[in-house]
């Protein structure tokens, strides 16, 4: 009997507990009239946060948590019309508004629902003049070799006996590897920062980072000096790993020797090898997938040297706001002597914003008064419309939420603009950081280059540009095609997922971007006028064309065999009467006769008129005609004579393929 009573009591207890849980669950279930769906979504995202405790070791779990918004690798499909989608959604939003739908605030907040909210608490940096910053070295940096060559970034000039070896190394690697190999991998460098940078104090609760370096057939000492400089000048608690992506190199020193060498760092440095040549762009996306330990991804080119206290200023803005992407100030390492100097241009402090002309060539323009007014001190980070692309830092998850790089971009070129536009137009910020400086070696003339693999096809960079403008420039893309008319018929693949990304994230228009962020671009590079005609300028019924021969800024154009490949033989004449090639104009030389090519803006060298039916170019200021000597291969102007066959020309369109 006692057994039955105990069994009954236990049964009643279980049933009662179950009913109590049901009542509690019902009380917590959201009702249809719940006023804060945004809050619930954010709470759910926090619960699923793969790095909920950022104040700890900051190690991210497996890569299955990170899925690109844009499918990767590249898939082909069909282009969609973003404007038609916008019009349809606009009509839908208006219907919701009239029907008592969401408030304008709710609609604006939707832009950020696909990005994880900021959960990391970080205090703003504090400037304390005269008090050395908490991340500044307390003692002068030790040299790699006392009194050694290249220490303190002083130039190393070799004698004439090294000339042949130097030329061979430049041809193979793009740098003077003879000098580089003589310089310590741990050499000391000069400090090019403003004095004020030394007195910034940063919250020590910084995010950790994975440094990603992509290389293809890089010289040994320039690559390893990049790695050594990062390890030497980065506080160890923040450096989660250095990830090297070997993009299908075939140099022997980048195989077993590299594998053995990096064992010195007990797993801190890792190398992953691509099974085929992917190109710099997609290799960086691969690097993001392989780098799993750091909260921030820092991309460096394979021939850099980070400077003193580079890390804290670069990562601090990201620690405060995860949608900020930062770029260090890039100094120039001379590829011959390895001296480090500030990059030219910019304002009186050497500060510049990243920009472009309408043919999509990278430019630097001085910091504007408006941007200066946004800062309290001259060493604070400042806004830039674009980055050069080789060196930057971005929160890892945010980069994945942005979809990494467009998977349709190939090898190199245009990716710096694509990621810049994507960040700005979709709710992020791009900041240049004056107190974080990194030296970079630029390839020297005479380098043989790294040709793209056969599977890529021709004109990969131009195709990249077309993809970028088709996705991000909206109606401004017409200005690109005015500057690069040969690209109008260029196939650029499927961009439907990229446009869907823009729509899903309520990314702003390029017009907004040009007015609010890149407002100074048109003052330096005015919108180009329409073209009257474009193509090769061929001597009428001949096989000879005008060729710039790669000359710029004052060189004379010549006559050469027509090759139908564009490039140095591609010109355009616009409604402003300018005869142009990229950002260069044709004009008469100092002798008043020979025709030269020189840099111009839209207010210069409005000198030419093309009479298509007459096959004639007239030089307006002189009233003379464009002429040629097929014997001397010269191009000049002379008195107009309708009987002279050498004054007859035709422009034939050339389309890139």
Swiss-Prot record:
EC number assigned by the record: 2.4.1.41
- The answer to keyword Secreted applying to this record is no
Q: Which reaction does it catalyse?
A: L-seryl-[protein] + UDP-N-acetyl-alpha-D-galactosamine = a 3-O-[N-acetyl-alpha-D-galactosaminyl]-L-seryl-[protein] + UDP + H(+); L-threonyl-[protein] + UDP-N-acetyl-alpha-D-galactosamine = a 3-O-[N-acetyl-alpha-D-galactosaminyl]-L-threonyl-[protein] + UDP + H(+)
Pathway given in the UniProt record = Protein modification; protein glycosylation
Cysteine disulfide partners in this protein: 197-435, 426-507, 545-562, 585-600, 625-640
Which of the seven top EC classes does this enzyme belong to? transferase
**Positions of the UniProt region annotated as Catalytic subdomain A:** 206-317
- Membrane-side (Lumenal) residue stretches: 30-657
Residues annotated as domain Ricin B-type lectin:
532-652
Q: Where is this region: Disordered?
A: 31-66
Which family does this protein fall into?
A: Belongs to the glycosyltransferase 2 family. GalNAc-T subfamily.
- Comment, domains: There are two conserved domains in the glycosyltransferase region: the N-terminal domain (domain A, also called GT1 motif), which is probably involved in manganese coordination and substrate binding and the C-terminal domain (domain B, also called Gal/GalNAc-T motif), which is probably involved in catalytic reaction and UDP-Gal binding. The ricin B-type lectin domain binds to GalNAc and contributes to the glycopeptide specificity.
The role this protein plays is:
Glycopeptide transferase involved in O-linked oligosaccharide biosynthesis, which catalyzes the transfer of an N-acetyl-D-galactosamine residue to an already glycosylated peptide. In contrast to other proteins of the family, it does not act as a peptide transferase that transfers GalNAc onto serine or threonine residue on the protein receptor, but instead requires the prior addition of a GalNAc on a peptide before adding additional GalNAc moieties. Some peptide transferase activity is however not excluded, considering that its appropriate peptide substrate may remain unidentified.
Q: What is this protein called?
A: N-acetylgalactosaminyltransferase 7
Source organism per UniProt:
Pongo abelii (Sumatran orangutan)
The organism's lineage is: Eukaryota, Metazoa, Chordata, Craniata, Vertebrata
